[in-house]
Every structure is written in C-alpha cells, then in structure tokens.
C-alpha cells in the first residue's frame, strides 16, 4: 500500500507538508488520505484528529465574540480592554509602509464608530489603552489572512501579512460595537 496525505480542513493548523502549527486551544482537524495499491486508489473519508493547543479550553472565562468572519480560535481570560480618550493606534515602525493603509482606514472607521479622535503613532511597544499592530509574526500558520490578537491593558495584533492585520481591525470594530467600547 502507498498512503498519501491529501490535506486538512484547517491548513492554518496542519499544512499540506504535515507541519503542525500549534493552535491556541485543542482543535479537531479533519484529514483525508489517498490509499493506493497497484492500479487501484481510493480517497478515505475524513478522519478527525485532535491537535493539542497551547492553552486548556477550561481557562476561557470571557465568551468568544460573535464577529464576521467568525474567530477561528479564542481563549477569553479574565478582564477586558476599554478604549479611552488616550487610546492610540500604534504601528511598529519597521512596518510603517506596509501598514499605512491599515492605519488610515482603522483611524477613520474607529472615529466614525466611536465618535472619538485617535492618533496614529509609530513605536515598538504600546501603552495602556492602545491598539498595536505589527507584522512578521513567527507563527507561519497564520497565513495571509490570519492574525493573533492579545488583549490586556492594550490590544496587540501580530500578523504575517497586512491582510491579516486589516482583518483584525474589522474584528476589533465589531467587538467594540457589541460591547460598549470594550473587548473581553
């Protein structure tokens, strides 16, 4: 028999070359194989495999926000982020050119939605109540459209590509609208 891996439904977690990108929480991934014997070959049905996550799903306290497109993974720990009059959009200066459009559109959308002015600055670290954006994430499983958002006293967004960082702004705006200007 020859067995060939065809693919998974979550390529962000299990690549075609079988590289595993550890998810945030345990995630069920469906995989398919091609089985060949001589001139005959068959495609298997989907097999579900659980890929262990970085965090236990039991630590999630805050519910996953409902946004479109849906968040692929979520761990909601205790506490929340609240915007303030001092909130800023902080762009990693190494990616100033790549994130220029994001900064411009997020600023306009944020001001239209909240009625609050927000400044765009370039720095390597955010302050309290800031939105921080950077590229060059080491998590290659994020692919072009993925992002990792960490919420604490600031909101930090890491992406591999500017498209993923832009999608993060859309999720942020939807969550702020639903939760009276806070992010769980």
State where each predicted segment sits.
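Beta-rich interaction/scaffold domains
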Residues: 1-59
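Acidic, contiguous N-terminal accessory segments
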Residues: 52-184
